[in-house]
Amino acid sequence: YEGTTGIQALDLLGRKVLLGTRGKCVRDFSRIMLRSAKAHWLAHGSIGRMARSTAKRAIEWNLVTLRIMRRVGKDRDLVGSASVDYLMYSGYVMMAHFWVRQAAVAQTFLRNGKGAESAEFYRAKIQTAEFYFDRLLPRADAHRKSALAPTRSLMQMGNGDFAFS
């Protein structure tokens, strides 16, 4: 990636997560995620499943961050190679948190009938959250794996290897 995505990714991982807070920003937000998920993880059905998945992702996000922090001192290419995948991974994980919160509120309004919107709106909100967890959130796994991949394959080509006669 080049341009905006690459720059924002380098800023997130390099400046904000690693240098600025030594991972504290991730620990703080994932603590919020866990607290929110805990309120629903024993629920039956999709809300409980989504809450448990969110809790797992919050813990995993901390582990991914810690693994990068431990390797970065020995591998100067790691921040550049991991940053875009780390950005994408973080985005998917954070959105899981917001989707499960929205779905839980929608379920409450469906049950008590006190929401300002129609029942169809709240059902659609829950269905959209289910779609996110089933179809989009699994993409985070590939980004996690790529962010943690060795940099050797990325950096092994020399400058001369890019010139063909």
Pin down the residues of each PLM region:
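Catalytic phosphate/nucleotide-handling subdomain of diverse soluble enzymes
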Residues: 1-20, 24-25
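Generic recognition of well-ordered alpha-helical segments
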Residues: 9-13, 32, 95
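C-terminal amphipathic alpha-helical interaction region
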Residues: 16-20, 35-165
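Active-site or pore-adjacent capping/gating segments
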Residues: 23, 28-35
